[in-house]
């Protein structure tokens, strides 16, 4: 299973803005995240990318601490050995001044 999870704070507390920032950092285009109108996770703000190679990226906003977010890779195929891509994603977002990294799951 491919996985990655990065917990961070974003002072502006806007899931769409942080989605555009992360989309630009990872994909060089600001509009890869979508889906806020369809909450997939127990009525918490959640945006996601299209499925690519059996995975998608998701950003979830904590409903209690609205400046707290989680960026994760969701493997929809869930086959094979564990592959952790946390370090690779951190490489692209760690120097972004708008993001304060909180916790990295590995």
Range-by-range predicted roles:
Residues 67-69, 75, 79-106:
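Long protein-protein interaction modules used by eukaryotic assembly/scaffold proteins
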Residues 31-72:
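Short, intrinsically disordered low-complexity segments
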């Amino acid at each position: 299973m491919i996985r990655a999870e990065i917990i961070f704070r974003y002072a502006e507390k806007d899931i769409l803005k942080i989605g555009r920032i992360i989309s630009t950092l990872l994909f060089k285009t600001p509009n890869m995240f979508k889906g806020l109108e369809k909450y997939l996770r127990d009525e918490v703000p959640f945006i996601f990318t299209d499925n690519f190679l059996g995975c998608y990226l998701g950003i979830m906003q904590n409903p209690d601490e609205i400046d707290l977010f989680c960026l994760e890779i969701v493997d929809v195929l869930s086959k094979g050995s564990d592959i952790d891509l946390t370090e690779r994603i951190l490489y692209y977002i760690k120097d972004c001044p708008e993001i304060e990294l909180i916790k990295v799951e590995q």
